[in-house]
């Protein structure tokens, strides 16, 4: 690794500091002391300041890089000390020879110099033994003398000691002190012992000092590495996770160099992760931690693109919150205000994108549980249950105008799209400003978008009064019985649809007079109260319901009728299922959403679930009409079914008489019924199934001679229209096939023909234009293998191989005879034997593939 300023991965430092750090590392062996701890100005160059404050994380990173580079240079510049060891072994041999001559060598002294590690570990014993031996040689006695060397002056001893200290401070660049005896006072043997002692001390000092600094550097590297990875563990973006994995790499002295290369290559990723952490540490992290992205799911099944989600509660003390965009609702009554609480986990939640913000709606709304949802744009709180009219003044409604119309929230808490409230009905809402928020939003594109966005913008305060669960036994069959104009009639398909008297021509419902205050006549209100106590509206067991469906499945048609009682008297009218305007709306909706009705296609076509076959049988329908009228109340008693509670039906069926008096039940039921019919999956009739691709409808015979429907005739008519023979009548390939090379080497067989009118037989026939002279010449050229003549072929004037028989003929007729004979011989004997003709066979050379037993050459 090159020690240049641009190659060392320091970050957030100015040029002077980087140059100072680079110079220190480049000139490390020239310093008096190579210990990094002895150079505080170098470590201070790693400090990164943000104004007057020190960025601890960035400073820690630069310190980490500095210690990595220090360890790298310390390892690369370390000498091997082999020269010192060679001198030690030479001097050891001199001493060993003397011991052998005196008979004192027993092998112990020699074994101490076998390897460097053993010498370094046993050097203290070697030192004492050498001093005792030198003193005995120099002074003639074995008396120990407390001197580091044998018969050296104090000045020499001091210089040697200084030399060892310098080697300890800088083991990368050292000098060897020369011990000599100019006046031969000690002799060669004693001088050799003094040199051996000094070199032994120098060798041990160099090794131990380097090992000490290497351990210090590794300790600093590991400590700084753990601190950095610990900081990045709190961040969850990709760069932080990747950098954390890199910093968690186990390091040893041998792996520092490779780790430095990884840091250098991933410098930008690690730098950006540290910058993002430094920028985010100024914001406080909540005690329960940030919400995980996987705890939330959007309505469309896609995850949000951003990695951070809005907080569940709004903290006005946080500097990052935009107070101008927050809308805090104030209660207008003595009811306790709703307090938004932080939830640590939302196991199931929906995310609705509304005007640039996220509205989190919990899915337990349907079960009557408490639901809280907030958004950064506006404080939204959707509560289960509907407040009565008396407490409506404490409700804060958040409504928005649309460019194509206004939609409001009536007293029942249900959206009324595209319908403007009359002045009389709007005056009954008390002190509530229905147009409190006039912020324009983007217009929805469909009915389902209107409902979803409208429900998301509800801002209803929780009511202390308990509202009973819709479809409970202490409530009427459903809330639709309170509306004298719209009534939900249950079809046998299980999907309710609206039977509206206002859609029937000549209906007497149009003559019903309504009060200007409530929209409902007082007489009808009293009748509605009486209807609640009737036995006909009480629920029947599900077993009886299934029994009644089975009994009427095959021999009765469904005829939807109702009995309407007005102020002038009782009037009864019948609307058949075939002529019902709702079925026309349903059919139109099914044409739009044709792909949504696959679920019940099998049941409808076979007369299964829903008994739709009887629905379109004219004979049974007319028989049902003549049998008499029946009251829809009794039909609801017999065919009672209990739909699954959902958000729309719970709000629709939770109405009380005060909502009817407000005059909004009609509009509400109409809008919700149209939406229900729009998304229904069970009302696709047989006419929609038989709807062909051209857009015309099949006219099926409804009666035969016996007055009953002829199912066989209908089936034949269906099969006749969808005749499989005519299915590919006009089928033709748009693009002609390109000419291909036949594997049998057909001579220019033209295969680029239409497949619908021409077979492959004509394309495979062999046709030689004229007398075939050109084709024969081309074929004979292919047989030219090895430039040799054979018994069957000879070289012509144009250097082409020509059959011998053709060399003797002159007229075209004779050539044709020769060719015919050759082909017959090929057919009888198979391909020409390889011994006779080398290379490709005659059939291949001629390019002819015979069919059957003869070949026609034209």
From Swiss-Prot:
The gene is U11. Belongs to the herpesviridae large structural phosphoprotein family. The lineage of its organism: Viruses, Duplodnaviria, Heunggongvirae, Peploviricota, Herviviricetes. It is found in: Virion tegument. This is Large structural phosphoprotein. GO terms for molecular function: structural molecule activity. Phosphorylated at multiple sites. It comes from Human herpesvirus 6B (strain Z29) (HHV-6 variant B). Homotetramer. Interacts with the major capsid protein. 180 tegument protein pU11 tetramers bind to the virion capsid. Its main location: virion. The keyword Phosphoprotein applies. Keywords: Phosphoprotein, Virion, Virion tegument. It comes from the Viruses. GO terms for cellular component: viral tegument. Residues 603-629 are annotated as: Disordered.
């Amino acid at each position: 690794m090159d020690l240049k300023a641009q190659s060392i991965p320091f970050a957030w430092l100015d040029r002077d500091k980087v140059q100072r750090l680079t110079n220190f590392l480049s000139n490390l062996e020239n310093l008096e002391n190579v210990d990094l701890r002895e150079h505080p100005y170098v470590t201070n160059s790693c400090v990164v300041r943000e104004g007057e404050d020190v960025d601890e994380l960035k400073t820690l990173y630069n310190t980490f890089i500095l210690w990595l580079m220090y360890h790298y240079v310390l390892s690369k510049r370390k000498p091997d000390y082999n020269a010192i060891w060679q001198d030690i072994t030479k001097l050891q041999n001199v001493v060993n020879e003397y011991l052998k001559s005196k008979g004192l060598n027993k092998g112990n002294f020699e074994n101490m110099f076998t390897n460097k590690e053993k010498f370094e570990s046993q050097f203290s014993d070697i030192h004492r033994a050498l001093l005792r031996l030198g003193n005995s040689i120099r002074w003639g006695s074995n008396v120990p003398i407390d001197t580091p060397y044998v018969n050296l002056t104090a000045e020499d001893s001091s210089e040697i000691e200084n030399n060892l200290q310098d080697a300890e401070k800088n083991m990368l660049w050292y000098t060897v002190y020369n011990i000599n005896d100019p006046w031969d006072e000690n002799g060669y043997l004693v001088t050799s012992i003094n040199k051996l002692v000094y070199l032994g001390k120098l060798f041990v000092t160099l090794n131990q000092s380097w090992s000490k600094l290497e351990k210090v550097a590794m300790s600093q590297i590991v400590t700084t590495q753990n601190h950095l990875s610990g900081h990045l563990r709190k961040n969850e973006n990709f760069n932080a996770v990747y950098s954390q994995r890199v910093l968690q790499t186990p390091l040893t002295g041998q792996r520092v160099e490779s780790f430095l290369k990884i840091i250098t290559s991933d410098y930008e990723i690690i730098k950006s992760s540290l910058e993002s952490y430094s920028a985010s540490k100024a914001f406080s992290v909540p005690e329960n931690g940030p919400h995980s992205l996987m705890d939330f799911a959007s309505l469309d099944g896609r995850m949000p693109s951003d990695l951070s989600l809005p907080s569940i509660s709004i903290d006005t003390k946080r500097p990052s919150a935009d107070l101008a965009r927050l809308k805090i609702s104030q209660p207008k009554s003595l009811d306790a205000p709703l307090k938004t609480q932080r939830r640590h986990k939302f196991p199931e939640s929906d995310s609705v994108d509304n005007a640039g913000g996220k509205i989190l709606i919990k899915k337990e709304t349907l079960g009557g549980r408490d639901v809280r949802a907030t958004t950064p744009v506006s404080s939204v709180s959707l509560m289960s249950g509907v407040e009565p009219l008396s407490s409506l003044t404490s409700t804060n409604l958040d409504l928005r105008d649309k460019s194509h119309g206004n939609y409001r929230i009536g007293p029942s808490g249900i959206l009324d799209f595209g319908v403007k409230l009359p002045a009389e009905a709007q005056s009954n809402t008390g002190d509530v400003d229905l147009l409190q928020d006039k912020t324009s939003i983007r217009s929805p594109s469909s009915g389902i978008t209107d409902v979803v966005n409208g429900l998301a913008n509800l801002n209803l305060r929780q009511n202390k009064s308990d509202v009973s669960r819709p479809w409970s036994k202490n409530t009427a069959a459903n809330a639709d019985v309170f509306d004298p104009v719209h009534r939900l009639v249950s079809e046998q398909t299980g999907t309710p649809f609206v039977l509206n008297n206002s859609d029937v021509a000549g209906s007497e419902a149009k003559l019903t007079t309504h009060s200007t205050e409530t929209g409902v006549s007082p007489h009808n209100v009293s009748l509605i109260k009486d209807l609640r106590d009737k036995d006909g509206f009480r629920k029947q067991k599900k077993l009886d319901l299934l029994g009644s469906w089975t009994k009427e499945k095959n021999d009765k048609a469904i005829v939807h009728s109702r009995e309407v009682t007005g102020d002038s008297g009782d009037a009864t009218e019948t609307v058949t299922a075939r002529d019902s305007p709702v079925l026309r709306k349903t059919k139109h909706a099914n044409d739009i959403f044709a792909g949504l009705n696959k679920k019940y296609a099998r049941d409808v076509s076979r007369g299964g679930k829903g008994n739709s076959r009887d629905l379109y049988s004219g004979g049974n329908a007319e028989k049902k009409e003549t049998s008499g009228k029946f009251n829809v109340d009794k039909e609801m008693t017999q065919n009672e079914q209990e739909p699954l509670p959902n958000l729309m039906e719970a709000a629709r069926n939770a109405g009380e008489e005060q909502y009817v008096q407000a005059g909004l039940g009609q509009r509400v039921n109409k809008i919700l019924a149209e939406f229900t019919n729009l998304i229904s999956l069970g009302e696709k009739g047989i006419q929609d199934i038989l709807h062909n691709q051209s857009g015309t409808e099949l006219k099926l015979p409804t009666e035969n001679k016996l007055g009953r429907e002829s199912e066989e005739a209908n089936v034949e008519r269906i099969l006749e229209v969808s005749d499989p023979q005519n299915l590919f009548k006009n089928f033709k390939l748009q693009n002609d096939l390109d000419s291909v090379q036949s594997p049998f080497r057909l001579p220019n067989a033209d295969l680029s023909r239409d497949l619908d009118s021409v077979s492959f037989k004509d394309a495979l026939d062999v046709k030689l234009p004229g007398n075939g002279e050109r084709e024969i010449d081309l074929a004979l050229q292919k047989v030219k293998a090895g430039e040799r003549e054979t018994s069957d072929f000879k070289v012509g004037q144009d250097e082409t191989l020509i059959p011998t028989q053709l060399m003797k003929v002159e007229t075209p007729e004779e050539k044709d005879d020769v060719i015919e004979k050759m082909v017959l011989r090929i057919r009888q004997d198979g391909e020409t034997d390889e011994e006779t003709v080398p290379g490709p066979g005659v059939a291949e050379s001629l390019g002819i593939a015979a069919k059957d037993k003869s070949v026609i050459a034209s």
